[in-house]
Regions:
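Conserved alpha/beta enzyme-core scaffold
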Residues: 1-198
Length: 198
């Protein structure tokens, strides 16, 4: 399987005004860094041309300046959930220029799967590698990456060459069934692995 390699600016061109975008990662670890900055640049260019541009932003947790900071400064976020901790985001939220839903971050993936928060148009995730058959080896933070990759129409993968390739096999990605079908998580001893490494 071959994958198209594009620049961050080209990747940003796949994201449109009013899209809902799910970002992988958990805190700054594993959060995409280059593509969100390119989205912010695109938003600023659209605003300078007199056109609207703002997206819904869904993340696994707080992020980094390249995502929450850059997008907030560019007035590129219409809706944000769950947890965030960036000063620029807080200022935009408090000035009522961004809708914010302070949901507990552990509820987000399930609520997205239920469809409570609308359609995820694009997933943007950071990865260490992508196998020939399309398995995504995530970086140092997973967050909601598995859920948004399942739900999105398009997936943009930001490869982080600073992550060691030895991260392959590090993860144990498991998504429990949604209620009312959820069962216990079958981890009974520290060495149990119940999910997949990709």
């Amino acid at each position: 399987m071959s994958f198209k390699v594009i620049s961050a600016e080209e990747a940003a061109s796949y994201i449109h005004h009013d899209d809902n975008v799910g970002f992988g990662g958990f805190t700054a670890a594993g959060t995409p860094k280059v593509v969100p900055a390119a989205i912010a640049k695109k938003a600023q260019e659209e605003h300078d041309a007199g056109r609207p541009f703002a997206i819904g932003v869904f993340t696994g947790a707080s992020t980094n300046d390249s995502l929450d900071g850059a997008l907030s400064r560019a007035k590129a976020i219409k809706t944000r959930t769950p947890y965030q901790s960036h000063k620029d985001s807080r200022n935009v939220i408090n000035s009522r220029e961004m809708s914010y839903y302070d949901m507990h971050l552990s509820h987000l993936a399930q609520n997205l799967r239920y469809g409570f928060l609308g359609k995820i148009n694009v997933a943007v995730i950071e990865a260490t590698d992508v196998s020939e058959d399309g398995k995504i080896i995530l970086g140092t933070g997973v967050g909601i990456a598995p859920t948004v990759c399942q739900l999105a129409d398009k997936i943009i993968i930001e490869l982080n060459s600073h992550n060691p390739k030895e991260l392959a096999g590090f993860h144990d990605i498991y998504q429990p069934a949604d209620p009312p079908y959820r069962r216990e998580i079958p981890v009974y001893k520290p060495s149990d692995r119940i999910g997949k490494p990709y």
